[in-house]
């Protein structure tokens, strides 16, 4: 396992309780802009984790084919239950394997902030036959979210195991800066949205609640719980409406749909 400054870069290989949940806003935008027109779409989910998003996609569009790309072996194994195919490795390694056929959508769920050169990373897709013409659906953490503004005002900037200050994050984005980046990279913004921030602000508590499940390898314990189902049904819709009033302040993630110009 690689280490940097004394910290393991792969927190799934540590005792850290990594709790995975689906990005419901990202999946909703994928359905609206891709799956409604092409229910049998081929989708590549980069950094698919244990397959939380892929499971949601399969429920909404059973004929869709999701190819997951995931470097972590344990997560990739779990994702095989939800994806049509899983490639264990990085995106660069997957592309080097010369994937066959055309993909209709490219999912980057909290991936871009881990890249050294996000503009170059996005521009590279225009050169790949398999992804040419694919709709890009991506999310990134929102640096302008309300609780981060308070932290910054208090002079606090400590890296953590997850969230906005994840120690593997190399880039930080606001809604405006992400829109500019997509433009510079040659993409036309089709739609944007945000995910509510209340559940994310409870992440430390959720990790403690599901720590035993995660220790047994069940990183989807939260996503599969009755409590999360109730939250999505009863609370998240209200949160979402409030979040849309001021997404730059109240959104935890910025979610965008874009197409190459």
Which residues fall in each region the model found?
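Short, conserved SAM-binding segment of the class I
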Residues: 120-128, 181
